[in-house]
Amino acid sequence: MKQLKARVTAVALATAALVGGVGTVGAGQADAVTRAAAASPCPTTIGRVVCVDLTHQKLWIQDGRKTIYGPVTVRTGRKGYATRPGLWHVYWRDLHHVSSLYDVAMPYSQFFDKGQALHAVDIPMSTPPGSHGCVNMTMHDAAAVWKLLKVGNAVDVFGRKPGT
């Protein structure tokens, strides 16, 4: 509840500042609003955890309750290939993985549930209809996430992607 109030307050203050003509929102203020938005409830708050919000197509990384990266926009599974919700753990990492199933490069792959992985793609995150179940990120975000994770870190996938 505190997280929800903090998020609502941060968004309201930023909106009031812009609408009321108080001035522009600076980088620090915008960052605070972004971080507050990342506080939408990630069910897991113990240790380092990747939070994947399917409903909003966002990913961020937390240490406990503190957001240390993101949120960033991601692209998850399309209809028939939904990214499976649940609490998973990174079990295998491959910097230069190539899918044997789809014969496609999957840079910065971090597998968390059978063949589903966090990895980079070279297309916009808004490209429909979605992935084959993986959590796609930009090359920049995938490289940053790669540096922050190791085998054993939690991956909490929650919500539901519209249309799946």
Enumerate the language-model features and the residues they cover:
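Cell wall/extracellular polymer interaction/catalysis modules
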Residues: 2-21, 26-80
